[in-house]
Structures are given as structure tokens and as C-alpha cells.
Amino acid sequence: ILKGPTAMGMVKLMDDSDNGDTGANHYNFTIAASPDEITPQIVQGNVDIAAVPANLASVLYNKEGVDVSVLAVNTLGVLYIVENGDSVQSVADLKGKTIYASGKGATPEYALNYMLTANGIDPEKDVTIEYKSEHSECVAALAANEDAVAMLPQPFVTVAMTQNENIRVALDLTEEWEKASGDGDTKAALITGVVIARNDFIEAHPDAVETFLQQYEASVNYVNDNVAEAAVLVGNYDIVAAQVAEKAIPECNITFIAGNDMKAKLSSYLGILFEQNPAAVGGALPNDDFYYNAD
């Protein structure tokens, strides 16, 4: 699982697992700092279930020799444009600026490019996007430069604001994405993270997968309903400090969406990415068999 909202939604299940309270299912959790650490583990078959960026799930599905299904959406939009100052009131104000970001080749890059392009800003020419390998480096860049602008996900927005009172949220990428993607039924949700599993594991252990999904949904509900208690667990697992987690959890869009609802939301999101850059989803949109327990 990825360090961030994904891992935060999983903490109650991790705690139950450590206390031997997960019934017949036994778990071995690993928290990774970036998706690059997770991909080879799935490809090599070392991991049965993984929480990954939404587009990476599609890339893996399209990869030869990798057979995966998506079990659930676990994180909606968590990206924000933050700045050290007060110069960004709209997307148009980003023109000519340097934006620090991480997540090149994943949801953050595509969401940023989509938002800029929809507002008439060319990501290649009209702004300078400096990609860092980890979110913490963007937080450091914000602290070091008085007029810096960064794109950060929660909980790192809260981390940055805790470290520097001059940092403010300028734009919510989820709102900007929805504005850009149309009205009413055509509006596509910005999806950050999903849970996938190897198909050979699903076929060999169908009951264990169903139990996992029930326990994971319960964990997500616990985290959203018991923020203070969940924040302590987030701190215990060294994801972010408990006091940061307590402020961040309500902003993290931690969710559990499965079945047909997952398929509807995720397929429309991947469709937008595909239009923008087919490589973002692995060159082709996944077939129906990608979506676990969906018609």
C-alpha cells in the first residue's frame, strides 16, 4: 500500500491484523513511499493485493504476463495547488509560474495537465513543472521559496501548512477537474487510488478476497467515522504524525466503492486519461473483465 490516504484507510485493518482480529485471513502489509516500489512486486507475483494509483492499475492490466483485476476504488481526489503567498486565485493565475509536483506518470501529472489544458494553458510552454520523486521534496521547495507553488496531495498539504503558516490552499484539483469534465451525468470523478489483486490469487482464494473487501470497507468506515482514534493508528504506522493525520483525514477523500459503481466511475475516469494520453492507461482501455464483481 502507498504511504498517504491509501494507507490511512487501511490502518484499522492493519491494527486488527497485528492484534490477530482478522479471522481466517492473515495479512502481511508493506507500506511503500512510491508506486515504483509496488509495480515490480506485482509483476513478479510477490504481492497478492496492492493499492495503486488508478491509472497504474490499467497499465498493469495491459502489461503482457500480468493478470490483475481492480477490486475497489479507495481514494477520490486529494490533490491541491498550494502556494507560499497569495497570487493564485484561479487556474489562469498559474500561467508563467513554476509548479513543484511529484507523481510524474501517475494521477497527479495527468490531473494537472488536464486542468491546465482545459483552461487554455499549455503544460509544456506556459508553465514550468518541476517533478520531484517524493511529496516531501515539494514541501521542502515550498518552504525554501517565498513565491513557490506546488501541487500536493493530502495529507502532505496539511504537513506543509503545519510547517509554514504562510502556505495556503489556492485550488482544489477535484473541483477544477469536475468543472473541466462537463456537467451532470457527464461529469467524471477524479480518482486517485484503487485496490487491485492478481487474478490467480482471486481464483485460488475467492472467499479470502471477499473477506478482505468486507474488512477493508469496515476499516475505511472506521477511519472516516473515528478520526481521532484513526489518527493515532496513522501515527503508530509512521504514515504521518497523528496530529497531522487528525486534520488531514477529513480532507483525504478516503472511500470504498466496488462493483458496478466502481466500474462506472473508474471507466469514465480512465476514458478521460486515454483521450489525453493513451500511454497513461497502458495504451488501451481495460475490458469488462478488469472490473471485479461488476456487470
Language-model regions, residue ranges each:
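Short, surface-exposed acidic
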Residues: 123-127, 238-250, 280-287
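Pocket-lining segment of extracytoplasmic ligand-binding domains
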Residues: 55-56, 137-233
